[in-house]
């Protein structure tokens, strides 16, 4: 048996092949999903794009949750206007609508949408349900539009990584500890990028479902493509208590299965972890931090000063008092943190204790109303409230900057998914900087019980005597609208004044003249830097208004530069060629009528983090035509660029890119090259000190993706097909 044949015996390939419409078992896959998920930052844009492309009804179960800006009082009525639009769309097209604060997106999927052997596509990067036997994939809105129009998700057949679990976690160790260690071991090297993680081994049976879910949801931070786990009696129990026993089936690899690599995790030796600013991979054990707090926090301070310069004043080392590190805030929330088991453990640790009445504060967000009901009935809520923890509804806010923003220079410890720069909501342009460290709920509770002194839960005594989770679906039956299979086309969509159509986007011309509007040399550029989240996301349904925030926390000049470039291009299209364009084209011998003029972003490795398509669409709305980088951090960001007509150029790793905003890039014959199937092209940099050659790559584009780029964006592509 060859490796390729044996790879077909993995759980991963069993699921992927059953969803591949080609059925050829080749190196390319064209996937149709079983269901889809979106939240209120993304579903309006997806539906607007799909409507413009010919949508008639939802052809698969599509659940829309309202868990992101539901507590964010920004812009008057605009948040609830989007929610009302979502319900009207669910009625019109046959969707599933989950009202505000009923559940965070991924918990609703776990409770109501997953099935063993199925695949779910979500417009959120943390779409991961592998621990329940359901492969989840997070992509930008364009990929969901394709599914709504009965098209496919096209990928190269991925490599598969075996994650072998052994041993049993010690008391006080939680899922975030294991997950942070996994991210630390894999992110920087990119060793599992765009691969599927398949979890197996004797350690799996030692982990309850909430523990598995907590690890699984964080696999996104490794930059893997998706995940899947073996299923067992614990998974069967999950489906049984959720009244869906028919959706369980045993998943395991064949007798001989080939994996491209293996990661071995000894759960017994896992320590309590802390992921320091500004990435989940920037991790040490809590004991290591306790041993050298000044040295470690000094390095974080230096990193912050390098990132933000004199825009902010950082004093992280001030958190060390008498050799102990003091946090200002503790948060347990979202799809990773707000589980029943995490809250039960936190409640047990804090029972009879107090978080104190000093600067330290704590909040907990059960991840769904059924979980909230369960922790209330079991007395966990009472234990937490009596200790001083504020209980809040199901809401993703602390995970992306729309809830519990810390004070300036505040150190927040969080059981959430990310701690990227400013993701918690601080605004460096206004001199603000908060710092977030990721920890497991157990150690956050131990820290809270110790007055904010960062403490490992493995170092405290406690007994968790709470009963196992009991699920109650009554609330969903009362509140969730499920119209799948029953569209009501006569329903009028309800538009608030902030919900706007997409502006005109132009087809690619024969040549492309680009002006650099942002040049970023950070090792990684996150989607939160490309378009901030938090309160900014309230403007998600107004493309022009949202684009005003593009790169605002990283390159404040970007929007102004891009608008000026776009203004000149619109004038060129009307026959008025600016001196800026004319001078540049004269140096390369090109004509203005054949050459578009657009903005361009250079970054070393852009696109880590969120699947939000706005990271690309905002560039396009501002006249962006291309990105240039050494590599894209994630497939989903690159796909977002393509779907919005932004050419995803790369350059060779040994090429220095020492150019500045205002320098230009001329790409002759780009339209012909893309449509002819070429993968590289010679271009020219028009810099302040002369014209220089540069070689650009645009590899691994499908025929459809090439046409999307030529047409200018996905919407134009579908319009042209009608």
Where are the language model's segments positioned?
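Fe-S-dependent hydro-lyases/dehydratases of central metabolism
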Residues: 1-722
């Amino acid at each position: 048996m060859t490796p390729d044949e044996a790879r077909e015996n993995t759980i991963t390939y069993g699921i992927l092949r059953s969803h591949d419409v080609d059925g050829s078992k080749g190196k390319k896959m064209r996937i149709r999903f079983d269901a889809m998920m979106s939240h209120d930052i993304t579903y309006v844009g997806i539906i607007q794009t799909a409507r413009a492309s010919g949508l008639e009804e939802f052809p698969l179960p599509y659940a829309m949750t309202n868990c992101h800006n539901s507590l964010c009082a920004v812009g008057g009525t605009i948040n609830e206007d989007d929610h009302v639009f979502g319900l009207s769309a669910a009625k019109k097209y046959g969707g599933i609508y989950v009202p505000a604060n009923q559940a965070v997106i991924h918990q609703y999927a776990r409770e109501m949408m997953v099935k063993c052997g199925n695949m779910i596509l979500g417009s959120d990067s943390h779409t991961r349900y592998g621990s329940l036997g359901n492969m989840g994939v997070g992509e930008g809105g364009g990929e969901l539009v394709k599914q709504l129009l009965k098209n496919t998700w096209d990928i190269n057949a991925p490599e598969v990584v075996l994650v072998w679990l052994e041993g049993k976690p010690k008391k006080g160790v939680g899922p975030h500890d294991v997950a942070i260690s996994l991210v630390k071991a894999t992110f920087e090297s990119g060793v599992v990028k765009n691969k599927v993680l398949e979890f197996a081994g004797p350690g799996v049976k030692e982990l309850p479902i909430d523990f598995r879910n907590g690890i699984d949801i964080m696999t996104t931070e490794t930059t893997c493509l998706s995940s899947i786990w073996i299923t067992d009696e614990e998974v069967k129990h999950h489906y049984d208590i959720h009244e869906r026993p028919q959706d369980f089936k045993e998943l395991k690899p064949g007798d001989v299965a080939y994996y491209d690599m293996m990661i071995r995790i000894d759960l017994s030796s896992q320590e309590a972890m802390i992921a320091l600013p500004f990435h989940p991979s920037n991790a040490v054990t809590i004991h290591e931090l306790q041993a050298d707090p000044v040295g470690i926090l000094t390095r974080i301070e230096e990193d912050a000063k390098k990132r933000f310069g004199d825009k902010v004043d950082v004093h992280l080392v001030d958190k060390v008092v008498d050799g102990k590190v003091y946090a200002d805030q503790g948060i347990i929330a979202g799809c990773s943190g707000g589980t029943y088991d995490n809250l039960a453990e936190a409640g047990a640790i804090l029972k009879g204790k107090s978080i104190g009445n000093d600067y330290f504060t704590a909040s907990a967000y059960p991840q769904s109303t059924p979980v909230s009901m369960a922790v209330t009935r079991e007395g966990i809520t009472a234990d937490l409230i009596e200790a001083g923890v504020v209980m809040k509804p199901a809401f993703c806010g602390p995970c992306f900057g729309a809830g519990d923003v810390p004070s300036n220079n505040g150190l927040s410890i969080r059981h959430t998914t990310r701690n990227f720069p400013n993701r918690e909501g601080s605004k460096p342009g206004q001199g603000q900087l908060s710092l977030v460290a990721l920890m497991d709920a157990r150690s956050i509770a131990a820290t809270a019980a110790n007055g904010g002194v960062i403490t490992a839960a493995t170092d405290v005594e406690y007994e968790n005597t709470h009963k196992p989770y009991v699920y109650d679906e009554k609330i969903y039956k009362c509140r969730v609208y499920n119209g799948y299979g029953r569209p009501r086309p006569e329903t009028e969509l309800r538009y608030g004044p902030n919900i706007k159509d997409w502006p005109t986007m132009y087809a690619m011309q024969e040549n492309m003249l680009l002006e650099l509007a942002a040049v970023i040399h950070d090792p990684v550029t996150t989607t939160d830097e490309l378009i901030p989240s938090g309160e900014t996301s309230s403007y998600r349904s107004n493309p022009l208004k949202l684009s005003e925030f593009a790169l605002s926390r990283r390159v404040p000049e970007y929007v102004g530069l891009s608008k000026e470039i776009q203004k000149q291009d619109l004038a060129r299209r009307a026959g008025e060629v600016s001196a800026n364009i004319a001078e540049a084209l004269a140096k390369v011998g090109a004509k203005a009528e054949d050459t578009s003029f657009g903005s361009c972003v250079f970054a070393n490795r852009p696109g880590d983090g969120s699947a939000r398509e706005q990271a690309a669409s905002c560039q396009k709305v501002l006249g962006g035509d291309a990105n240039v980088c050494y590599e894209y951090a994630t497939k989903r960001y690159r796909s977002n660029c393509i779907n919005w007509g932004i050419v995803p150029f790369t350059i060779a790793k040994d090429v220095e890119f020492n150019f500045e905003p205002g320098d230009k890039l001329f790409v002759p014959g780009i339209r012909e090259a893309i449509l002819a199937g070429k993968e590289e092209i010679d271009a020219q940099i028009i810099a302040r000190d002369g014209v220089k050659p540069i070689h650009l790559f645009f590899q691994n584009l499908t025929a459809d993706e090439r046409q999307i780029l030529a047409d200018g964006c996905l919407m134009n592509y579908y319009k042209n097909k009608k």
